[in-house]
């Protein structure tokens, strides 16, 4: 009989969001008339920008002609999109990133997991706690951890607590690590890093030969012009960091799928014999072997993000969701609930009232307010006693959800 990958058996009972879906399904079957408002999973709700829709329509029509048809595209992405990304997202901010260093993909979630394909299994790994679960679970699946303890923490991972006491800013690891995941603006806490904080991480990584995997999926939501959007705005980051970005949240591409990863040329790791190896070459080889590229139609839609019309429309989308976040913060604060985040990120991280545990508060909101959020403990042991609410919904639903919560 075929052997399974037993590392999957080490995973906790369920990935956070499937467990939420299971509880919602059970509740909805018992309460079919309940009008649920979902402020849980970070899926957008507003329509795709018109500039992107029009660009995709043109691309579809092109595909219906002999001269405009496109089959397999380059695995790394079309040059015109890579150049637009490099120019608008990096070079305009002083980052020395060129088009060849951009790899277009179908999701930063995929890339942050798939990057493990090119990294050795003996690397010592650090994650924040709480943390986006994919970083942990992908390492478990790949056999890079031991078993989980009672709190859900896995042997072989270094956990860096982030909480109100430390301003949701992890401290530099006290034990040696080779690989660290950083996410700013942070999911789930909504915290953001200053230039000085990122410079400290880059200095640490360069001094200790550590690779930073930097998730910047929510950078478009940063409101303060003095805060960095990319780790490559920090001196020395090209030598120690890979960055993941996405069109999902700023341009509403959760259903159309387009993202990109930046792997600077010259960024190196060690082979088994101790020689230096460029990670760009390995990632390029990995993508060429395991990925067929994002569709031409979708990439044309993503390119339109960088048009004048597209920029105006995605800025309006971001402003819409950030207004939702401001409403959530205001109403929860008025209800006497301690809140964090929601100022430079579409997530509000709240302290559960009355010492309720995270899943208890989830069930409380579901049963009594018919509002769905995300239990903080699902993001790690240090998330216990916290809860995440997402700003991704209509204004009407956000207002109604807050009315219901305040009425509890």
Swiss-Prot record:
Enzyme Commission code(s) on record: 2.6.1.83
N6-(pyridoxal phosphate)lysine: residues carrying this PTM: 249
UniProt KW keywords: Aminotransferase, Pyridoxal phosphate, Transferase
Record field: transmembrane: none
Chain residues that bind substrate: 15, 42, 109, 132, 187, 292, 388
Pathway(s) where this gene product acts: Amino-acid biosynthesis; L-lysine biosynthesis via DAP pathway; LL-2,6-diaminopimelate from (S)-tetrahydrodipicolinate (aminotransferase route): step 1/1
Catalytic activity: (2S,6S)-2,6-diaminopimelate + 2-oxoglutarate = (S)-2,3,4,5-tetrahydrodipicolinate + L-glutamate + H2O + H(+)
Residues that coordinate or bind pyridoxal 5'-phosphate: 72, 108-109, 132, 187, 218, 246-248, 257, 292
One Pfam family per UniProt: Aminotran_1_2
CDD domains: AAT_like (cd00609)
Function according to Swiss-Prot or TrEMBL: Involved in the synthesis of meso-diaminopimelate (m-DAP or DL-DAP), required for both lysine and peptidoglycan biosynthesis. Catalyzes the direct conversion of tetrahydrodipicolinate to LL-diaminopimelate.
Family: Belongs to the class-I pyridoxal-phosphate-dependent aminotransferase family. LL-diaminopimelate aminotransferase subfamily.
Assembly behavior: Homodimer.
Identification of the protein by name: LL-diaminopimelate aminotransferase
Organism: Prochlorococcus marinus (strain MIT 9313)
Gene name for this UniProt entry: dapL
């Amino acid at each position: 009989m075929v052997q399974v990958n037993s590392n999957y058996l080490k995973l906790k009972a369920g990935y956070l969001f499937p467990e939420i879906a299971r509880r919602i399904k059970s509740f909805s079957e018992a309460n079919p008339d309940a009008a649920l408002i979902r402020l849980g999973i970070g899926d957008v709700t507003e329509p795709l920008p018109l500039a992107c829709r029009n660009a995709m329509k043109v691309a579809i029509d092109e595909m219906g002609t002999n001269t405009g048809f496109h089959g397999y595209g380059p695995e790394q992405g079309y040059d015109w999109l890579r150049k637009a990304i490099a120019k608008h997202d990096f070079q305009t901010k002083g980052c020395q990133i060129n088009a060849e260093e951009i790899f277009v993909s179908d999701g930063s979630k995929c890339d942050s997991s798939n990057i493990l394909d090119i990294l050795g299994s003996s690397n010592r790994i650090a994650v924040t706690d709480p943390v986006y679960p994919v970083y942990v679970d992908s390492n478990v699946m790949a056999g890079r951890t031991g078993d989980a303890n009672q709190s859900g923490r896995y042997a072989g991972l270094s956990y860096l607590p982030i909480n109100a006491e430390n301003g949701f800013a992890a401290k530099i690891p006290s034990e040696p690590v080779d690989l660290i995941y950083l996410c700013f603006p942070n999911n789930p806490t909504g915290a953001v890093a200053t230039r000085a904080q990122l410079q400290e991480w880059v200095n640490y990584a360069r001094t200790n030969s550590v690779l930073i995997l930097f998730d910047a999926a929510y950078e478009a939501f940063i409101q303060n012009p003095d805060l960095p959007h990319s780790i490559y705005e920090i001196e020395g980051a090209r030598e120690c960091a890979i960055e993941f970005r996405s069109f999902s949240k700023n341009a509403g591409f959760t259903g159309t799928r387009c993202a990109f990863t930046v792997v600077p040329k010259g960024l190196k790791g060690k082979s088994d014999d101790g020689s230096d190896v460029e990670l760009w070459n390995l990632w390029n080889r990995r993508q060429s072997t395991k990925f067929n590229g994002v569709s031409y139609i979708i990439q044309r839609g993503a390119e339109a993000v960088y048009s004048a019309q597209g920029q105006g429309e995605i800025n309006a989308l971001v402003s819409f969701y950030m207004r939702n976040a401001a409403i959530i913060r205001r109403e929860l604060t008025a209800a006497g609930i301690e809140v964090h985040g929601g100022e430079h990120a579409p997530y509000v991280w709240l302290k559960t009232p009355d010492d309720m545990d995270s899943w208890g508060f989830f069930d409380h909101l579901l049963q009594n307010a018919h509002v769905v959020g995300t239990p903080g403990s699902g993001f790690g042991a240090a998330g216990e006693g916290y809860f995440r609410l997402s700003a991704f919904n209509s204004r009407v639903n956000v207002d109604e959800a807050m009315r219901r919560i305040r009425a509890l």
